[in-house]
């Protein structure tokens, strides 16, 4: 596939894991079926790390996390054709993402998905890495497989520490 890089919305994704090695996922308000890891756009002039920490606070409602790693390259995905007109006014055909692995060092009470006036998620839970892809929306499954492949060994090492 030839990628039109200007047609992809730049954003960050966050794989937030707890001390048991489980990953935070949320169920979006616009879906009853799919769960996803936090992600969001990068503001003008914002560094990737800043965007990731801001998105963590906005979507998960916590700052009780430490960045462990960042994936090597942009990961691209395309939206289904029927979804493009309804997302970002049809400006993008998909997203390009840089992913951050973050270790959560807080407790359950330190997560507040209603932190903003317009929350992203209606529910959340900790999920085993092995079951992340199964609950993801179909057009993001390959992204999740790539992120898991890149970060899974670092999660195991970080649990031990």
Swiss-Prot record:
It is an enzyme of class 3 (hydrolase). Belongs to the Nudix hydrolase family. RppH subfamily. This is RNA pyrophosphohydrolase. Accelerates the degradation of transcripts by removing pyrophosphate from the 5'-end of triphosphorylated RNA, leading to a more labile monophosphorylated state that can stimulate subsequent ribonuclease cleavage. It holds the Pfam family NUDIX. Its cofactor is a divalent metal cation. PANTHER family: NUDIX HYDROLASE 26, CHLOROPLASTIC (PTHR11839:SF22), UDP/ADP-SUGAR PYROPHOSPHATASE (PTHR11839). SUPFAM superfamilies: Nudix. One of its GO terms (biological process) is ribose phosphate metabolic process. It comes from Wolbachia sp. subsp. Brugia malayi (strain TRS). Gene3D superfamilies: Nucleoside Triphosphate Pyrophosphohydrolase. Keywords: Hydrolase. GO terms for molecular function: bis(5'-adenosyl)-pentaphosphatase activity; guanosine-3',5'-bis(diphosphate) 3'-diphosphatase activity. It comes from the Bacteria. A motif (Nudix box) lies at residues 40-61. Its EC number is 3.6.1.-. Residues 7-149 form the Nudix hydrolase domain.
């Amino acid at each position: 596939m030839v990628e039109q890089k200007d047609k992809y919305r730049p954003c960050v994704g966050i794989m937030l894991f707890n001390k048991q090695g489980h990953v935070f996922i949320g169920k979006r308000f616009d879906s009853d079926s799919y769960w996803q890891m936090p992600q969001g756009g990068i503001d003008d002039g914002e560094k990737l790390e800043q965007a990731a920490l801001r998105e963590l606070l906005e979507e998960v409602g916590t700052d009780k996390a430490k960045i462990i790693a960042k994936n090597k390259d942009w990961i691209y995905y395309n939206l289904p054709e029927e979804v493009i007109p309804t997302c970002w006014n049809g400006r993008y055909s998909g997203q390009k993402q840089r992913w951050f692995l973050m270790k959560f060092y807080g407790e359950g009470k330190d997560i507040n998905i209603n932190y903003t006036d317009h929350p992203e998620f209606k529910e959340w839970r900790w999920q085993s890495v092995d079951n992340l892809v199964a609950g993801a929306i179909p057009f993001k499954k390959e992204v999740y497989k790539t992120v898991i492949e890149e970060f899974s060994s670092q999660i195991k090492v970080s649990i031990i520490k």
